[in-house]
A protein has these predicted regions:
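Conserved N-terminal helical subregion
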Residues: 1-93, 101-106, 161
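Short, conserved catalytic or interaction motifs in soluble domains
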Residues: 60, 114, 215-218
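Central beta-strand plus flanking loop segment that forms part of the substrate or channel wall
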Residues: 87-122, 132, 140-142, 148-152, ...
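Short Gly/Pro-enriched turn/cap motifs at secondary-structure boundaries
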Residues: 99-102, 122-126, 187, 195
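Conserved FAD/dinucleotide-binding core of flavoprotein oxidoreductases
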Residues: 127-190
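Conserved mid-domain beta->alpha element of the FAD-binding
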Residues: 188-228
Length: 228
């Protein structure tokens, strides 16, 4: 497809019933996942949640590790697990390098409501500037992940609501009727990152502290969960 010409009539449809009864996957809102994990964490007797908290220093040695918090408390452990994101301070402090690649693309993310039901169907358009993903949410709402050239993304995000929604609608098409913005829009740069190694002395890196990929396949979170 192309924004100026609308949605292409060419498409590839994946039908999960051809391989089984279950859907290919589920889309769960971040706030729901975080809420569920927080609730579960409070029920586990062998887990202590310390929040809010910031780590001041981490000292790792042959016998274990000492983690000093900003408030002065020191936690002693046999293993430090770094799950502190693609710019992981733990990875850097351990001297573990990483290979990185910038795609010169920016993801513009927003949520829209629409007149017609999406029937739980996810759609991804492949446009010249990058994929435009429409991910079904609860009710008549859809999350948009619009990949755009980094040079152009600020101009689109800087439009007023009517102008921005018009650009979204041109790409989205009218298959779900008129759209309405729900909540804020935000952006993040897209890039690849892979740590040279995942472990160090009394240290293990997981999730985006170890590996980060392009969101086109929607597997970043899944890969992080698999690490656990």
């Amino acid at each position: 497809g192309h924004p100026s010409r609308g949605v292409s009539p060419l498409f590839l449809h994946y039908d999960h019933t051809e391989v089984g009864d279950d859907p290919f996957g589920y889309i769960i809102e971040n706030r729901v996942i975080r809420g569920g994990l927080s609730q579960l964490a409070g029920q586990l007797e062998n887990l202590t949640v310390i929040a809010p908290a910031s780590v001041e220093t981490v000292e790792r040695h042959a016998d274990g590790a000492d983690v000093m918090l900003e408030d002065g408390r020191v936690l002693q452990t046999s293993l430090v697990v770094g799950a502190d994101g693609r710019n992981s301070p733990l990875r850097k402090s351990a001297g573990i390098g990483a290979r990185e690649f910038r795609y010169d693309q920016t993801a513009i993310v927003c949520t829209v409501s629409h007149e017609r039901a999406h029937a739980g169907i996810a759609v991804e358009l492949f446009l010249p500037s990058g994929p435009f993903a429409m991910l079904p949410m609860t009710g008549q709402r859809t999350n948009i992940v619009w990949t755009e050239c980094s040079d152009l993304a600020p101009a689109f995000v800087g439009l007023d609501d009517a102008g921005f929604l018009g650009e979204v609608q041109r790409r989205f098409g009218d298959w779900l009727g008129a759209l309405e913005l729900v909540g804020p829009r935000f952006t993040y740069p897209l890039g690849l990152m892979h740590a040279d190694r995942y472990t160090g002395l009394r240290l293990a890196l997981i999730s985006e502290a170890a590996h980060a990929i392009h969101p086109i396949a929607g597997q970043g979170l899944n890969l992080g969960i698999c690490d656990v």
